A protein has these predicted regions:
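Flexible, solvent-exposed loop/hinge segments and secondary-structure transition points
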Residues: 1-163
């Protein structure tokens, strides 16, 4: 549990984390299949409401996964009420190739997501625009898996929480 809370704090610091408020919305999203269909098969695992000291929601933390090159890539995504990504983290070791897909855990890659909105795409060769993420050279599959999971998280918050 300590590593889970640490991954939450990395993407969205809060006084309290509530994993019960949106459990029904998560079940609905998982069963209707729209989010997976819209985001390259990315799936949602859990959702947590981040709260301040007064109990007011400050954002949402969504844990999801998508198929990477070496296996399932699990990503924790912080999303604020303006549908901006506050950060991402990897709660488990990535099953990706060392020196390639493993570079997703380096700040040069994962810090690109902070402040971005919905419907991001992966751009090869650098020079990513506002709604784009620079792919890791030689690891486009991993880059796409992470981006699809982030997109699934923001779509879930938009369509099932803030609707």
């Amino acid at each position: 549990m300590a590593s889970t809370i640490a991954s939450y704090k990395q993407v969205m610091p809060a006084e309290e984390y509530d994993d019960e408020t949106y459990a029904d919305a998560l079940t609905t999203a998982q069963s209707d299949g729209k989010i997976a269909a819209d985001n390259g098969g990315a799936s949602l695992i859990s959702v947590v409401a981040a709260k301040d000291a007064s109990g007011a929601e400050t954002g949402y933390i969504v844990k999801g996964s998508a198929a990477g090159y070496g296996g399932s890539v699990i990503v924790v995504v912080g999303v604020d009420a303006d549908l901006k990504v506050t950060g991402i983290s990897f709660p488990e070791t990535l099953p990706e190739t060392a020196g390639l897909g493993q570079k997703a855990t380096e700040p040069a890659f994962y810090e690109q997501f902070a402040g971005k909105g919905t419907k991001l795409s992966v751009k090869k060769g650098g020079g990513a625009g506002e709604d784009e993420i620079d792919a890791i050279s030689g690891a486009t599959i991993t880059s796409t898996a992470v981006t699809n999971t982030v997109n699934a998280a923001t779509e879930f918050v938009q369509d099932y929480i803030l609707k």
